[in-house]
Amino acid sequence: TLKVYNMSILTDMFGSIAYREALKGGEGINTPHINSQQEVYTAMLEELELANSLYNASLGLDDPTKDGIYGGDIAKWQKFTNTLRLRLLMRVSGRNNAFTPTVGEQINQIISNPGKYPVFESNDDNATVKFSGSAEYYKTYFNSSSFPDDKSLSSDHHIAAQLLDLLYDASDGFVDPRLRIWIKPRYIQYPSATEPDVIREMIGAVSGCTINYNGITSISEREPYLHYETLVGDTRPNHMLDYDELLFIKAEAAMNGWISGSAKEYYEAAITASCQKWGEYGIYASYPELNASNKIELKTVAITQKNIAALLASDQVKWNNTQQRLAEQKWLSLFWVIGFQMYHEMRR
């Protein structure tokens, strides 16, 4: 399973790679044959089918503590395997007939037979790498050293306009509840108790351009930045593959007529799962809010069912039966999932 997971990132990034003869240096194969991307995908799907048949939930690991993803839970590894297979199938769904059985037929085969092909059922099944937060075990994918807060780092990681524009619209007051988990606005705190503090309006950075491209002359003015306390704290996990992505896959499969069920219901369940996943990070937040005296207080964040219902009913998010709306929200849900998944999803 992990071999396919890692090799899928390589082929999605670079196309043709060594696969069938790769990782065989011990057998004397030092110059492995390069396979086409279709050959790689065919082989990866075959290996995930094989892996599914090999997992035995009645057996455990001799030392479950060595498993930093599922703690030796074999049943969850099997769910991860089949959900990963669905990710890869949907990624090549534009070439439906290039595979035998077709992509749609394989997706239907998995989803319609949960007894043989169990998949993620909740956020409890998410594939994440956990970190203890001590010594070298705080160095996550996004965190090369211990960064407990945003001190001296807020100038480093600005939020792109493409992301911010899906989360925030000042013209009508739209704010995705996940924004306060992922992003912090610029703010000014004055020492005087009578002088009001200021929270800046948020304007996203234009990717690939200088900081003043959008008319801002100082990074301290309006460009928001990553919410370090929630995202790169020393014990925050790496997300590899999550339940919300599975639900988006089901929504797209339903739109394509490959599986039964309502695309709208799968879509709304996906966004709900994403919000619930990120809501758990709110206890680490340090988000600026103005109190009754117009002074800033840094607070934790909660995402309530009311917040989620309002999000699903908003003009920016509510289901409109289009691939664009589905693609935008799936792309957004892949924020902070490792392996360049937002990029791969956009390219497909």
What feature does the model see in each segment?
Residues 1-282, 320-323, 329:
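Structured, solvent-exposed acidic/aromatic patches
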Residues 274-348:
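C-terminal functional modules
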